[in-house]
Amino acid sequence: MSSNNEILFARAQKSTPGGVNSPVRAFRSVGGTPRFITRAEGPYFWDADDRRYIDYIGSWGPAIVGHAHPDVVKAVQDAATRGLSFGAPTEGEIRMAELICQLVPSIEQVRLVSSGTEAAMSALRLARGATGRDTIIKFEGCYHGHADSLLVKAGSGLLTFGNPTSAGVPEDFAKHTLVLDYNNPQQLEDTFKEIGNQIACVIVEPVAGNMNLLPATPEFLQTMRRVCTQYGAVLIFDEVMSGFRVALGGAQSMYDIKPDLTVLGKVIGGGLPVAAFGGRTDLMQHLAPLGGVYQAGTLSGNPVTVAAGLATLKLIQVPGFYESLATQTGKLVAGLSAAARAANIAFSANSVGGMFGMYFAAEKPQSYTEMMKCDVAHFNTFFHAMLDAGVYLAPSAFEAGFVSAQHDDAIIEASIQAARQAFAQLGQ
């Protein structure tokens, strides 16, 4: 007899490509049937078969205060009674912008949009418009949404201009995108010496979370800041994932580096669709209606989303919030590592704030190339053992995990105990 999840997946595939609205949800890389979620609360969610799971994806980052937090739910309910969307400015948008500028010192002005892809795409357009240059630099393994210019992966040559890695991306778009190695400061410096006056911007995840978890080295980001300043290129930190996730001021506050523009998302919407890009006033003044760089959106600054975001940002400003979050994430990572050692499994793990990564490799990867050498088959087996034990991890070996403020000691210990059993099975 088919489970409710299997029935829903079969039904979904008839009306939705692949049965999902974002590819990783399909379980294609790990195999099996995706879980269709019916409700969530705190650190848990429940699937269509009423099975409860400890959740470590947290909607891919936004659920930092836990699912269905009463303060966030009330803010959404109150806002909804006043209207869902106006197509006109509101005071809530001002409050959100003021708060972001207050919490992220590099941001002097900010504009709200509806998705991380839209924010990254707009930041690139702004950088090109402000500099009058076309070439952008991104790094292999970093994900900045699905805009055409950013779906590019380079070959191995130092100055190899990328071929599109998604069907439907014209080479004329891809040719302006140069892809370099993450955590390779010398390659970056050499590239700027070669074509620095042609480069409009460099965009980077300071804590990469879409090739599993891979933090940038301080030297890498310091070199980036220096050469961008030297050659007049715009430095863009994509903190859609790390912003308000690893620290109150984002990863840039941890590294003490000021980008020219920052892209935000996820946490600032409290679980509803929103993103933002902001930075230096002289750059932001190039945006319409003041300047010639056009950007607009029907639902930008949506009042219900803004209400959820403001409620979430209030909760994460409580003293000790990030210290506690990092402590719990560290306990999880230490417990997973100890369980793997006990089972003699080649495994390593890392954490930054409320993000963590698991690698089926003896040492923590330091580059995209090293990350690709991790044992995916072992991860897939581990994933399903944990899923069967009621622990929901990212259904991909190359996605970061997320801990919320609701993951207390009992939740962490239950997760580690499940991992002990999963590693033991893997070692047989």
UniProtKB/Swiss-Prot annotation:
Instruction: Spell out which residues are annotated as carrying N6-(pyridoxal phosphate)lysine.
Output: K266
- Kindly name one Pfam family recorded for this protein: Aminotran_3
Q: What keywords appear on the UniProt entry?
A: Cytoplasm, Isomerase, Porphyrin biosynthesis, Pyridoxal phosphate
Domain of life where this protein originates: Bacteria
Q: Which catalysed reactions does the entry list for this protein?
A: (S)-4-amino-5-oxopentanoate = 5-aminolevulinate
Q: Which GO BP terms apply? A: protoporphyrinogen IX biosynthetic process
Query: Which cofactors go with this protein?
Result: pyridoxal 5'-phosphate
- What are the EC numbers? 5.4.3.8
State which residue ranges cross the membrane: none
One GO CC term on file: cytoplasm
GO molecular function of the protein, one example? transaminase activity
Record-stated family: Belongs to the class-III pyridoxal-phosphate-dependent aminotransferase family. HemL subfamily.
What protein does this entry describe? Answer: Glutamate-1-semialdehyde 2,1-aminomutase
| Natural source organism | Herminiimonas arsenicoxydans
Gene name per UniProt? hemL
